[in-house]
Amino acid sequence: MIDTHCHIDDPQYAEGLDAFLAEQRQDGVECILVPGVDKTSVKDVLEVCDRYPEYLFPALGLHPENVKEDWHEQLATIKAAVDARMHQLPTVNSNLIAIGEIGLDYHWDTTFKEQQHEALRKQMRWAEQYNLPVMIHSRDATEDTLNILREFPSVKGVMHCFSGSHEVAKQVIDMGYYLGIGGVLTFKNCKLAEHLVGIPLERLVLETDAPYMAPVPYRGKRNESRWMRHVAERLAEVYNCSVEHIIKTTTANAKALFVIKL
């Protein structure tokens, strides 16, 4: 399994991280992708990934909830880090795996709605510049998000923590994007399983959004990458196939999208 979205730089994981990651590896997690969310997370994401250079892979970006008055400064700091990272001599894990976590979020506040749009466009241009995939966050902003993504047809990526309708899922995959499937699939009364019917398994990747969104039966706890197996088990029911087939296919999908060589 590959966890395509895990905030392992969160302080909740600081204590005992060596043992924690050893447990994930032992239970079938091949590697973990670690997105940034703002300028302060740049240092944390890169440092933790550099400590485990063949297991943790970094992404950098400005999360839409963090687009505030200082968004220009935020983007300038993050872009400088992106440029520096991409111009390093390549090693196993020196370069970025993606631009992310980026997108639009209107759930709590739309004060900076237009600034979110411009921040997303700027970061999509970074992805164009470096031929990197993107990790897209979209909450209560589906139409605007998809419209902006369509402005950049050469950029591909994943719709992180997907929980939308079948129609939206179709639009996303028709654009060449993947759907990031996490713990929400296991939640009671979740309609996502119905919405995935007819969506090719070849367009799905697994993720956690850890430390959040732990799947049943661990809902409410600090999430772990190895618990993606519960998501895979639910997907096996949806696609009427073995758990092993789900894991093999989603792992291959993640490796293809993010150009991961293990």
What is each stretch, according to the model?
Residues 1-262:
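Mid-domain alpha/beta scaffold segments of enzyme catalytic cores
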